[in-house]
Amino acid sequence: MQKKFINPEELPDWKDFFTQVVTVENHGVKTIYISGQVGVDKQQNLVGTGDFAAQTKQALLNFATALASANATLADVVKINLYVVNYKYEDAAVIGELLRQYFPAEKLPACSLIGVQSLARKEFLIEIEATAVSES
């Protein structure tokens, strides 16, 4: 079994706290773990203060970048977890619309949508983490 720890240069530098992407390769199968992605740019500046849709879109862009760093694609994603601060039913429509821009309707990954009180920074409204599986 081989583990690889990846902190893509295109993403914010959080390496003092966690690794952005961890891959585990075993018997020709690569499992990819994507740490929670939030609505910030490379310099950790918030994108969309108070704007749930803007933060979700940026978190998904960061998520796609993290996947690419492990030579994976959205088609490899098998599970996605979304943590939403003060979740409201209307948030599901925003999330659903944006997810459909990334994943084909017939191949959506398993998903958990979890309402939380807060995230790492008080201005974060959503965090997206995932697991992907591909051939190594």
Description of each model-found segment:
Residues M1-L61, T65-A70, A75-V78, V85-S136:
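N-terminal presequence-like segments and the immediate start of the first folded domain
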